[in-house]
Amino acid sequence: MLGKVASRVSLRSRERKLRLFLDLLAPGPETTVIDVGVTDAPFGGGSTDNFFEALYPWPERLTAVGHTSLERFTAAFPQVTAVRADGRDLPFADGAFDLGFSNAVVEHVAGGREEQRRFVRELCRVAQRVFVTTPNRFFPIEVHTLVPIAHWLPRGARDRILRARGFDDVLEPLGPSELALLFPYSVRVVNRGMTLIAVGPL
């Protein structure tokens, strides 16, 4: 029951993010977009992974980057160009894309703030404008596990709770100022309570 509720909340949150992306960055049918951080999991059936590819109006203009095999992704989204690569070392020229998108990925980048900064700056290098989201460290519910204040605990205790919930990814949550400092230029940070969204450059 809790899982179904969480899936519905997650989907609504992602739909709102897509609407905000469309409103703020105003892409059109010719706009090239890179999405960094896709997975090989299908969209639907309770999963909201790869929602951007499933809901974006012009999927043929998307390039999606993931760090694992993307065989199922490619089968599910044949119009999208899929590339396997490390988000910190993207195989594209400077400014190759009009827009860059990354949803709830940066908090999973291993290696602390410097590696998170490297990830964000690489997206900024290849895309002329970017839209980056992450859970808000100051929101009292840890959004991956729905455990209150789990992300405020010391790392050891936090990691034990995450593992007990079947979650073994790296988790380095960010607050608004920490997110803004990852960028090589000034960004607007939209605080939606549970979620932070950085859009830039200004």
Segments the model singles out, each with a brief description of its role:
Residues 31-139, 200:
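Conserved SAM-binding loop
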Residues 1-28:
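Class I SAM-dependent methyltransferase Rossmann-like catalytic core
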Residues 129-156:
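Conserved class I S-adenosyl-L-methionine
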Residues 3-8, 105-115, 166-170:
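Surface-exposed cleft-lining segments at the edges of enzyme active sites
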Residues 9-17, 115, 171-178:
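Soluble or luminal CAZymes and related metallo-dependent hydrolases
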Residues 184-202:
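Core SAM-dependent methyltransferase catalytic element
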Residues 161-186:
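Short alpha-helix
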